Amino acid sequence: MQAGVIAVQGDVAEHAAAVENAAAAHGEPAEVVEVRDAGIVPDCDVLLMPGGESTTISRLIRREGIDEEIREHVASGKPVLATCAGLIVCSRDAKDDRVDALGLVNVSVDRNAFGRQKDSFEAKIPMTGLDEPFHAVFIRAPLIDDVGEGVEVLATVDGRPVAVRDGPVVATAFHPELTDDSRIHDLAFFPEQEVVA
């Protein structure tokens, strides 16, 4: 399995380790490639859109021509995991003119709605598709404030969606790569198999 991490900005190394662990659990080797330029995404089986700064990520993927390749990847049914800023970039509406949302996940989001850096928090959250709660790390997390047709809510915190699936895209408001638990990557890239802790 070739996994591309959109590496224009954000948590690259952590996602690489998590996808390697998820693939290994299924007896499948993973080659992780960093995507900084156009021409790499078409060769990838799965994509990771990491956290970071959504305005920067949006601008750089558009400038490099990666945005259209990501859209084509999803249109072909190939999996994507988008986390935190990745969720914002992949949303239908980022409610920020500086973010050119890709429209891959039929949700609207409010950037940093869970608060500033000092308001970061961690929570054990039950999640559809996982046998045990997931330890989620929220850092300047976005809020999914509108869920459109065709979107499955996978997890909530205080009644607010924090993880969703829209076709081949799993998107989270939190950072699963900042834990030693690769089950979210597993859920995104091996959806047909049971995910156990």
From Swiss-Prot:
It catalyses: aldehydo-D-ribose 5-phosphate + D-glyceraldehyde 3-phosphate + L-glutamine = pyridoxal 5'-phosphate + L-glutamate + phosphate + 3 H2O + H(+); L-glutamine + H2O = L-glutamate + NH4(+). GO terms for molecular function: glutaminase activity; pyridoxal 5'-phosphate synthase (glutamine hydrolysing) activity. PROSITE patterns: PDXT_SNO_2 (PS51130). The keyword Coiled coil does not apply. GO terms for cellular component: cytosol; glutaminase complex. Pfam families: SNO. Keywords: Glutamine amidotransferase, Hydrolase, Lyase, Pyridoxal phosphate. PANTHER family: PYRIDOXAL 5'-PHOSPHATE SYNTHASE SUBUNIT SNO, PYRIDOXAL 5'-PHOSPHATE SYNTHASE SUBUNIT SNO1-RELATED. Belongs to the glutaminase PdxT/SNO family. In the presence of PdxS, forms a dodecamer of heterodimers. Only shows activity in the heterodimer. This is Pyridoxal 5'-phosphate synthase subunit PdxT.
